[in-house]
A protein has these predicted regions:
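Extended, charge-rich alpha-helical interface modules
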Residues: 1-130
Length: 130
């Protein structure tokens, strides 16, 4: 295992994604790996001086909700791909991925600001709305 520095928002994001995987993955071997990673990251998070469930409650919940929506959108896109159905619904789903990811990045930034993270993830995409 290698340890790398990441922003606090990125750590919490990863934990929320692993939590979602724990809910929806049924394959025993995959679930064992997910649980192992989840346990390692939760332990790391709780050991940090910045750890505080109280100050982040609504942000963590919002991040988990966005990540779960992304999970369902990605599943729906794959269903359309399997059926070779690239109509209006497929386009709407595909377009929602970047708006959801923008929302996700915003919440991660709020977490980083709230906790005074030393690392901040930066995004740089062309504006698509005013």
């Amino acid at each position: 295992m290698v340890e790398i520095p990441v922003s606090l928002g990125e750590l919490i994001d990863k934990i929320t994604i692993l939590f979602i995987k724990r809910k929806y993955i049924n394959d025993f071997d995959k679930l064992r790996n997910v649980n192992q990673e989840y346990d390692l990251l939760i332990t790391k998070w709780k050991s940090l001086k910045e750890y505080s469930e109280e100050s982040l409650g609504h942000l963590v919940t919002s991040l988990a909700n966005v990540n779960e929506r992304i999970w369902f959108v990605e599943d729906a896109i794959r269903d359309h791909e399997r059926r070779q159905d690239f109509g209006e619904d497929f386009i709407k789903l595909a377009r929602s991925v970047y708006t959801l990811n923008d929302e996700r990045a915003n919440i991660k930034r709020q977490i980083n600001l709230r906790l005074g993270s030393q690392i901040y993830e930066e995004k740089s995409y062309a504006k698509y709305k005013d």
